């Protein structure tokens, strides 16, 4: 799938521990010429970091396994992003979210 030009996104179904074991075995040369969205979190973070280090944007986002347990906005925002729509997130004060030790 990494090299398939017709594949536009790879949405990882669930986490696990396999990515860290195979990341050094993957050849990303063709992928770099035809990048695609890689979507997921957990174990997939290794793949995100690897691709981000090569200048490829990825989506650290909900996996399909649990998306039905989230709000409808979760699926909607992911779909909009994948189809090129953008939106702005506005906030007024995040000081209550900051933790200093």
Language-model regions, residue ranges each:
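Context-gated lysine
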Residues: 8, 30, 36, 69-70, ...
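Conserved anion/nucleotide-ligand pocket segment
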Residues: 56-101
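Charged/polar, solvent-exposed surface patches and flexible loops
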Residues: 24, 49, 76, 80
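Short, well-ordered, mixed-charge alpha-helical segments that flank or form enzyme active sites
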Residues: 18-21, 45-50, 66-70
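Hydrophobic structural segments
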Residues: 1-3, 49-50, 59, 99
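N-terminal small/polar loop signature for handling phosphorylated ligands or for N-terminal nucleophile
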Residues: 1-35
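Short, acidic/small-residue loops that bind anionic groups at enzyme active sites
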Residues: 26-51, 57-64
